[in-house]
Amino acid sequence: MNLAWKEIKFYRFRYTLIMLIIFLLGSMVLFISGLAQGLARENISYLNNMPAEHYIVEDNKEPKLESSQLNQSQQNKIEKIIHENATQMGTQTLKINQQDQDVITLNTPKHLTPKLVSGNYPKKQNEIAISEKLTGNDLKVGDTVTFKGHHHNYKISGIMNESMYSHSSMILMNKEAFKSLNKQVSTFYPVDKINKDNKESLKQIKGIKVVNEKALTDNIASYQAEQMPLNLMIISLFVITAIVLSAFFYVMTIQKIPQIGILKAIGIKTKHLLTALLLQIILTTMVGVILAFSVILILNAFMPVTMPFYLSYSQVLLMIVVFLIVGLIGALLSFIKVLKVDPIEAIGGME
């Protein structure tokens, strides 16, 4: 540790430069990762927060909640088996400050309602609970809104946490309000557990299918289209990080060959030199990534609620671990070089 720290202090400018590069790369990785997660949550946060493992939907080639049309006969048969009421969605356009915004209206059994950030669940026919993202349009509990093509005013009774599906904010309504507002609806059944007997019974109902959450998210076009390029960008940045660290530490090692030779000649073991190099890689990487995380955390605090950005601590921890692994991979050439240094050749004894 002492050897590693002394070397960092002696070559402070070089190590500051590599920390700055890691900081910039780390900031880019964390920001793009946060953007990817934020966009993902805008697509599937409703599904992620739903206490259900299975969904009973219309039997289509590509099952989607918004296109699940179950007739009354199918609903009656399903409800006799699972003893649950249906969840229904309807697409509407909300008028906000003279602007139109597409939203999804929702009516669902009480135990499946999204959690509230503030306010109360709608009880009256003229009350609604809105997704938290809509508060970015200066909406709050107590405000009234209208839907395009309708003249009724609806009072906001509550704000729901993370309630979005396919980039559309969700609006919770009671059964009567939902029916009076929506003429075209999609119907499905979120179910937590389905036993073997119920699965067999459901298979006998024509035109329905039991799917899991992944089957639904895979069929959200915007989810797949956004995640793939963003994840490729993150992978590319990790590759760039490995190349940069590899080049930096390899050049540093070549420049230090005479010193390494002298240290070996006076009895310093190779494992101590490798340990010093390892500690330098860990220290420079950790400092750069922690600084990047701090800056992104500060930026996140000032981002508006409408910005699709999200970073979890587990995600940040994973990024730090990946950066360390990438740094070690990038330093493999330096490790090999240190191992091969011959003290006599390094200090010019063979000339």
Curated annotation (Swiss-Prot):
InterPro entries in UniProt: ABC-4/HrtB_transporter, ABC3_permease_C
Compartment list: Cell membrane
Transmembrane domains' residue ranges: 16-36, 232-252, 278-298, 316-336
Swiss-Prot/TrEMBL keywords: Cell membrane, Membrane, Transmembrane, Transmembrane helix, Transport
Pfam assignment, any one: FtsX
Membrane-related topology note: Multi-pass membrane protein
GO annotation, cellular component aspect: plasma membrane
Protein's UniProt name: Putative hemin transport system permease protein HrtB
Organism: Staphylococcus haemolyticus (strain JCSC1435)
